[in-house]
């Protein structure tokens, strides 16, 4: 499965490293994308499509989004998101993804100086880029880095769904196009 995953989507994920601004209106999350993509040598289309897959709504990334053990929350402000986070923690919830790039608090909180820092769009996007780069270095391809960003090593079905969602977002945002292998892998029908 892993080799199939690599082969099927690799061309789409690495084919587009353009640093043009995405078509969507920029938000506070997007403002940091070009800088961190350059700093960590990540194709901008990959980073942006991961963000769209995580918190894309109304054509932009959402800085105060949470995923609380499967329940999505879009806050209007950092204070509102922090209040929702604190209520979830008080209710015993542990797996909470935070911010623009949905960094999991349980697994990654020690990489930030504070909870507040996890909600800061610049720090959230930068950590995401650093983490993606580490995954790419470990797994040798952007496709596998993207797959592991969202799901652990023993969850091939979730990895496949996530990679296909990221490819769809790359194509939709103008950062890539479907290759025959990616279409076949994701079950995407050819354009009419």
Locate each region found by the language model:
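Bacterial N-terminal signal peptides that target proteins for export
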Residues: 1-9
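N-terminal signal peptide c-region/cleavage motif recognized by signal peptidases
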Residues: 15-22
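Catalytic glycan-binding domains that act on GlcNAc-containing polysaccharides
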Residues: 25-192
């Amino acid at each position: 499965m892993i080799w199939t995953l690599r082969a099927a989507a690799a061309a789409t994920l690495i084919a587009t490293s353009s640093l043009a601004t995405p078509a969507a209106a920029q938000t506070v999350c997007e403002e940091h994308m070009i800088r961190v993509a350059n700093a960590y040598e990540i194709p901008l289309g990959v980073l942006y499509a991961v963000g769209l897959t995580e918190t894309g709504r109304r054509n932009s990334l959402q800085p105060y989004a949470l995923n609380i053990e499967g329940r999505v929350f879009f806050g209007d402000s950092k204070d509102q998101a922090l209040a929702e986070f604190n209520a979830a923690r008080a209710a015993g919830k542990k797996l909470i993804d935070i911010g623009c790039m949905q960094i999991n608090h349980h697994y990654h909180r020690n990489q930030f100086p504070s909870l507040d820092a996890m909600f800061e769009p610049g720090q959230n996007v930068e950590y995401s880029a650093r983490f993606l780069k580490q995954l790419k270095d470990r797994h040798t391809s952007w496709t596998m880095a993207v797959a592991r960003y969202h799901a652990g090593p023993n969850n091939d079905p979730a990895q496949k769904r996530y990679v296909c969602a990221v490819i769809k977002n790359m194509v939709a945002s103008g950062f890539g196009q479907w290759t025959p292998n990616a279409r076949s892998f994701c079950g995407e029908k050819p354009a009419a």
